[in-house]
Swiss-Prot record:
Family statement drawn from the similarity comment of this UniProt entry: Belongs to the elongation factor P family.
Encoding gene, per UniProt annotation: efp
Function: Involved in peptide bond synthesis. Stimulates efficient translation and peptide-bond synthesis on native or reconstituted 70S ribosomes in vitro. Probably functions indirectly by altering the affinity of the ribosome for aminoacyl-tRNA, thus increasing their reactivity as acceptors for peptidyl transferase.
Protein name: Elongation factor P
GO cellular component: cytoplasm
Amino acid sequence: MATTADFKNGLVLVIDGQLWTITEFQHVKPGKGPAFVRTKLKNVLSGKVVDKTFNAGVKVDTATVDRRDTTYLYRDGSDFVFMDSQDYEQHPLPEALVGDAARFLLEGMPVQVAFHNGVPLYIELPVTVELEVTHTEPGLQGDRSSAGTKPATLQTGAQINVPLFINTGDKLKVDSRDGSYLGRVNA
């Protein structure tokens, strides 16, 4: 059991028999009325995202989630294979479970896999990943009215928007949560 004061990103709640993870939360203290907590919850199994409001101080059931450090090894058909860093056991995870994170997965990348009762639930990439640009059009100085962006393809096949000065072969820092450009990696 946890109260709303214990809420943090990544906490897994049990609501109506289903597992939900908190992706965003905000404590709100209005001028009139009681305080409450506004949350954005993601269903661990289906990936569905919902907004839910809790009254301050309410007790909520939490799930025991074991996060293990793993390394992404390779893709085998529709499965992604991860190796546990503790016991070197390999865990093939289906594409549906890996989800959007597959866009930024590189072989040898350290990844956390969350388990509940021995069953893998989801993976957590590092917040920032370093990837190389494999293709982008050259940006011309006079082709915009204000600072602009252009599409770039990364070595994993993911496409993101980057500033015009980025060239093919540049190594970039990318936010793995939303795919946004964070900067160039100094070589």
